[in-house]
């Protein structure tokens, strides 16, 4: 991947971090924040959403474009959701626990709490909110975090309700689940102080660490999302939404910089060619006898083929902007927003069953010369007309520069067009929820995870890697409780982190293990009733039989700690079976026999004891 001189390009970037809070109930109702499976839904309903005007009488451009594609939104409701999520009951008062958690997060970011928090409605008509808006309130502003490339300012901290979970995209709409809708969410927006991809990732990691330090945020896939705003000099601000992994942020910034650089180069080339976009038209007759599967299928279903001539665009529609994404892909993104399956263009034709003769006839039909390109859409008449018009408009933009827009992050670091950038016209007051006066004086400062790592190393003599695993893990409180109860710190840490990870890799259902299971197992080791080596086997058995008592199950499995005479008997048996090897190698046979001894004892004996006895028996025979 090309690495640019970001200072020379004038890279400016900012982050929006969206993190679910781990509260018992949702932000504006008493429903639990428990996630559900779609199959558990007990009812469904549908909605059609349309944009509304802001308090200034304006309609947001992003919402307006969304409304041009009429779609049916179906929602899955559960016995753990209510009429508030369905927008059939007014919202309740703002959840106090969520507000307290948000204030604590703001404190860690060095922010100033607002004197009064007013709830607003943010227009969102993509179906992810049943009422066509998301409730949001500013809790704090100002603040900063440190990075190795300088400080990054924090603009604002919003407390919001999470959107509904997108379950299935359909031809005429989307299926959503209400279990996620209304979960409290904080949105942290940085100032545009980020000047490199590496700094963007570092800033996100720092904010993520601060969030997890509170112990009041949800963990797991989908509970945190990052949006990245990127622009370069002469380019435009582009918002990329839905980055799930911190590992993707720097690649995403690099690819967006590359995209904007390529688009600016295309602007210069089009200007030099005196390019122009022609008028879209129906070219169905050109393909009356086509054998192209896509086009033939559309025509057989009563569809049409529409085309737009792109004068001076020859060779540029196929120009790569990002990895495996071209200017033509950008055109296609806009066409698919209006229901088309995609586009064909002459930079890639003849292909896909379209013949050279059909390409020549197409050029003649729209008046395109050798230096021109042509894009086509084959679909039902209305979709084809709307989609090719969208392509024409995006081509016009390509001659002017980089468009401001919202894009969706792809897994490979590239992005795709979603909609225009939203503006202030999407906000208006929520009159059903009274304002609240935050009290920052009650906020306590939690220990940062980085500080916890250092303490674990100093107080418990854990190595840096293990200390970090425990501190950043889900069971650090259990770890501290067990150490206080007398369990060896290294054993407790390895059991709660390393052993669980190994069992998960072996497809053991470790999600069934509870704190009580771990307390029971570690207690058996501390009392001398279970060898450390038997811990993995007992935990695996408990995961399969979560209702079992650890002590009883250990006895059933024969994992009770072996006495020294039992250990010696097992070791002597191994040594005598391998007497020739012992006679020939002496202590050189130790490693091979140690493994056999541990296998014979099946985890019932501590490794140090087995090692000591084995050394004695080998030395006696050497």
UniProtKB/Swiss-Prot annotation:
One of its GO terms (biological process) is translation. It catalyses: L-glutamyl-tRNA(Gln) + L-glutamine + ATP + H2O = L-glutaminyl-tRNA(Gln) + L-glutamate + ADP + phosphate + H(+). InterPro entries: Asn/Gln-tRNA_amidoTrfase_suB/E, Asn/Gln-tRNA_Trfase_suB/E_cat, Asn/Gln_amidotransferase, Asn/Gln_tRNA_amidoTrase-B-like, GAD-like_sf, GAD_dom, GatB_C_1, GatB_Yqey_C_2. Its EC number is 6.3.5.-. Disulfide bonds: none annotated. HAMAP family: GatE. Belongs to the GatB/GatE family. GatE subfamily. PANTHER family: GLUTAMYL-TRNA GLN AMIDOTRANSFERASE SUBUNIT B MITOCHONDRIAL AND PROKARYOTIC PET112-RELATED, GLUTAMYL-TRNA(GLN) AMIDOTRANSFERASE SUBUNIT E. Allows the formation of correctly charged Gln-tRNA(Gln) through the transamidation of misacylated Glu-tRNA(Gln) in organisms which lack glutaminyl-tRNA synthetase. The reaction takes place in the presence of glutamine and ATP through an activated gamma-phospho-Glu-tRNA(Gln). The GatDE system is specific for glutamate and does not act on aspartate. This is Glutamyl-tRNA(Gln) amidotransferase subunit E. The lineage of its organism: Archaea, Methanobacteriati, Methanobacteriota, Stenosarchaea group, Halobacteria.
């Amino acid at each position: 991947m090309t690495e640019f001189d970001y200072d020379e390009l004038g890279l400016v970037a900012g982050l929006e971090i969206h993190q679910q809070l781990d509260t018992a109930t949702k932000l504006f109702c008493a429903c639990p924040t428990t996630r559900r499976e779609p199959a558990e839904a007990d009812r469904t309903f549908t909605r059609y959403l349309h944009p509304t005007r802001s308090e200034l009488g304006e309609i947001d451009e992003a919402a307006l474009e969304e409304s041009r594609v009429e779609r049916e939104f179906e929602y899955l409701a559960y016995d753990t959701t209510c009429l508030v999520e369905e927008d059939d009951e007014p919202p309740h008062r703002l959840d106090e626990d969520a507000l307290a958690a948000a204030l604590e997060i703001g404190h860690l970011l060095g922010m100033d709490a607002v004197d009064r928090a007013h709830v607003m409605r943010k227009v969102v008509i993509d179906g992810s909110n049943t009422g066509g808006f998301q409730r949001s309130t500013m809790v704090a502003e100002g603040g900063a975090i440190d990075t190795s490339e300088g400080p990054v300012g924090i603009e604002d901290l919003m407390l919001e309700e999470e959107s509904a979970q997108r379950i299935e995209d359909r031809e005429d709409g989307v299926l959503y689940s209400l279990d996620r809708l209304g979960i409290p969410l904080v949105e942290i927006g940085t100032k545009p102080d980020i000047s490199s991809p590496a700094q963007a990732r570092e800033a996100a990691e720092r904010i993520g660490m601060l969030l997890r330090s509170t112990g009041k945020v949800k963990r797991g896939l989908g509970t945190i999302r990052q949006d990245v705003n990127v622009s370069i000099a002469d380019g435009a601000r582009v918002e990329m939404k839905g980055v799930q992994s911190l590992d993707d942020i720097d690649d995403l910034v690099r690819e967006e910089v590359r995209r904007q650089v390529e688009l600016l180069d295309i602007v210069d080339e089009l200007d030099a060619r005196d390019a122009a976009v022609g008028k879209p038209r129906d070219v169905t007759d050109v393909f009356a006898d086509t054998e192209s599967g896509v086009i033939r299928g559309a025509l057989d279903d009563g569809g049409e083929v529409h085309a737009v001539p792109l004068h001076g665009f020859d060779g540029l529609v196929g120009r790569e902007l990002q990895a495996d994404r071209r200017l033509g892909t950008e055109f296609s993104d806009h066409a698919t927003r209006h229901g088309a399956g995609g586009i064909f263009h002459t930079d890639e034709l003849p292909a896909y069953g379209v013949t050279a003769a059909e390409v020549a006839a197409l050029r003649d039909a729209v008046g395109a010369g050798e230096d021109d390109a042509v894009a086509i859409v084959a679909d039902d008449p209305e979709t084809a007309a709307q989609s090719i018009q969208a392509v024409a408009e995006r081509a016009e933009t390509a001659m002017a520069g980089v468009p401001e827009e919202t894009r969706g992050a792809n897994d490979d670091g590239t992005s795709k067009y979603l909609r225009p950038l939203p503006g202030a016209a999407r906000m208006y007051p929520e009159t059903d929820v009274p304002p609240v006066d935050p009290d920052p004086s009650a906020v306590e400062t939690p220990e940062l995870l980085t500080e916890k790592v250092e303490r674990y190393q100093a107080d418990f003599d854990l190595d840096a890697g293990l200390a970090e695993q425990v501190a950043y893990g889900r069971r650090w409180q259990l770890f501290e409780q067990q150490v206080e109860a007398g369990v060896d710190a290294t054993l407790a840490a390895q059991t709660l982190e390393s052993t669980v990870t190994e069992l998960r890799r072996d497809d053991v259902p470790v999600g069934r293990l509870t704190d009580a299971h771990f307390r029971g197992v570690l207690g058996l080791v501390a009392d001398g009733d279970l060898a450390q080596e038997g811990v993995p086997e007992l935990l695996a058995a408990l995961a399969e039989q979560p209702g079992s008592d650890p002590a009883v199950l250990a006895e059933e499995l024969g994992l009770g700690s072996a006495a020294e005479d039992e250990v010696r008997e097992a070791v002597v048996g191994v040594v005598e079976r391998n007497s020739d090897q012992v006679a020939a190698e002496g202590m050189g046979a130790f490693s091979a026999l140690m493994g056999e001894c541990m296998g014979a004892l099946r985890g019932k004996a501590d490794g140090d004891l087995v090692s000591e006895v084995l050394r004695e028996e080998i030395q006696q025979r050497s």
